[in-house]
């Protein structure tokens, strides 16, 4: 869960949320920076696959910041494939002082455009309803990126249509 520092990570409302929802929001930037630095320095790593949830709750600001970090990986020569999930859209909020406030969210419909440079643009098969996709990650090797979230079914569920698509 990448959380942009501007969505807040302190105050009474934040502390209350953390009692039941521990996502390391305050530390996520440093964690991503450290992990990506290690991946960049690892000359054997050619392909990086990052399954969602990519952001805390789909805050557009968090997606934009995370994408900047992904470009650093890509510029180092790594091939990157992400798969979005349920926390990447809807239910966006932030913390300011001691309050939980609304934050600009990311519509489900634009996620694949945001992450086009990180797998979705290379899809050889794509399920528009769930954003699941197939991509050839290297010669002769295909990745099936399954997202079991959509606007038309409960988050975290796969229906018969989705299973048939995956086959």
Each language-model region and where it sits:
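N-terminal active-site segment of His-dependent metallophosphoesterases
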Residues: 1-60
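A generic secondary-structure signal
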Residues: 34-42, 68-72, 165
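Extended active-site neighborhood of metal-dependent phosphoesterases/phosphodiesterases
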Residues: 60, 65-164
